[in-house]
Amino acid sequence: MQVLILLSLAFLASCVVAYSRRRPGGRGAGNLPPGPPRLPIIGNMLQLGQNPHKSLAHLAKTYGPLMSLKLGNQFVVVVSSPEMAREVLQRHGLVFSTPCAPIAVQILGHGEVSMNMLPATSPIWKKLRKIAREKLFSNQALHDTRAVRWERLRKLADYVGRCSGAMNVGEATFTTMSNLMFSTLFSVEITQYADSDSDSGVNKKFREHVNAITRYIGVPNIADFFPIFAPFDPQGLRRKLTYHFGSLLELVQSLIEQRLRARNAATYRKKDDFLEMLLDLSEGDEYDLSVNEIKHLCVDLIIAGSDTSAATTEWAMVELLLHPDKLAKLKAELKSVVGDKSIIEESDISKLPYLQATVKEVLRYHPAAPLLAPHLAEEETQLNGYIIPKNTKIFINDWTISRDPSIWKNPEMFEPERFLDNDIDFCGQHFELIPFGSGRRICPGLPLASRMLHCMVATLCHNFDWELEKGTESKQLQREDVFGLALQKKIPLRAIPIKV
């Protein structure tokens, strides 16, 4: 990819030299945060590497918690400390509340109606955010849908119990989360477990689309660094994402159309799912909600809900299998609280401090989004005495914060015990642990993700003993990751479940 960038720049350098040398802000560079030296035209692009979160963490050791870079024509500031993250997300939250979506995902009209891409000042964003907060992810809404989650956990336990050898843990958790999202939204299941005879057609295509979307969004795009190249789509990312994202939109559109036709029947009985509630809202006057907005909202929820929680659960199992003593502690706690029940109740979570500590430690050690969704400075402002020009892209490196030795004792070690004697949580107020973000742009699905992370880990650990597949015992091998929308394992976890 780097070769492609250099070749493209070589052919088109004459078009971008003047453009790339403009000052990053409207009133001049001023006292910018420190940063590494830059190459002409491309700036610091080559320093990102294949794992930008790790490359930026290394640079931050030299240039500090507020570091400036030039990525092509984009001026970027990287935040690498809890104090600076609080400044950006809380104290200056309105200035930095606009998301900075990659050009490749600004497709099919999604940017005009997506809760993930609209600025916080947008009336549509405010409307969708209110619906998500009050109707989808409120305590009452989640209480009303707890049976749906319990059933998905039961099916996960049943599938694992049928496995007679090594199984792909990440694939199983992805299937569980995908079916949970579709059941919650549409009262249907879209994927099957690996031993199903019907694992074909829509099932395989859905996995392909979600995996491709999360992978391609994480690929550095020359069109983001040099927007004048955007019409040419030099890496084909826009074309690929249009296909995969468009396919998910078509799938959701078909489910919505089926429901709309069914609702017109005289004998129709309402479904107890989110789509029914959203369509009811669209027919009322309070929200002025369109079917198109419902479609794009559902796709956003499916992508985010299917991938990140599944990946985090897989990482949890990796660390517990690499640390049998931690797994034994967790199993003992589950046995004492859950007893002979095979499926944990969500009400049990508050009685399981070691389970809670384990989930927190996984989110610290393997943050699902190592670089939180980038923000854009709506106006020139100051942070820590430095000028942040208007239109600066802000990255918050949660991976760096989570492994900072000045914050965490033994940060490179997996130790759930570190959370047993403090009240640190991941709900956005403790900036040393913000895997879901904070402030206006905090992940609206956090309450659902938290419930499922705890319950999936508990289900897998309470009902089964585990062994790593022979030849995969290396910690280095198991911890290799791939940067993307969610931080995925490079080599899927294959482990052998033993029914207890």
Swiss-Prot record:
It catalyses: 11-hydroxyferruginol + 3 reduced [NADPH--hemoprotein reductase] + 3 O2 = carnosate + 3 oxidized [NADPH--hemoprotein reductase] + 4 H2O + 4 H(+); miltiradiene + 2 reduced [NADPH--hemoprotein reductase] + 2 O2 = miltiradien-20-al + 2 oxidized [NADPH--hemoprotein reductase] + 3 H2O + 2 H(+); ferruginol + 3 reduced [NADPH--hemoprotein reductase] + 3 O2 = pisiferate + 3 oxidized [NADPH--hemoprotein reductase] + 4 H2O + 4 H(+). Pathway: Secondary metabolite biosynthesis; terpenoid biosynthesis. The keyword Kinase does not apply. Its EC number is 1.14.14.61, 1.14.14.-. GO terms for cellular component: membrane. Its cofactor is heme. GO terms for molecular function: heme binding; iron ion binding; oxidoreductase activity, acting on paired donors, with incorporation or reduction of molecular oxygen, reduced flavin or flavoprotein as one donor, and incorporation of one atom of oxygen. PROSITE patterns: CYTOCHROME_P450. PANTHER family: CYTOCHROME P450, FAMILY 76, SUBFAMILY C, POLYPEPTIDE 5-RELATED (PTHR47950), GERANIOL 8-HYDROXYLASE-LIKE (PTHR47950:SF4). This is Carnosic acid synthase. The gene is CYP76AK6.
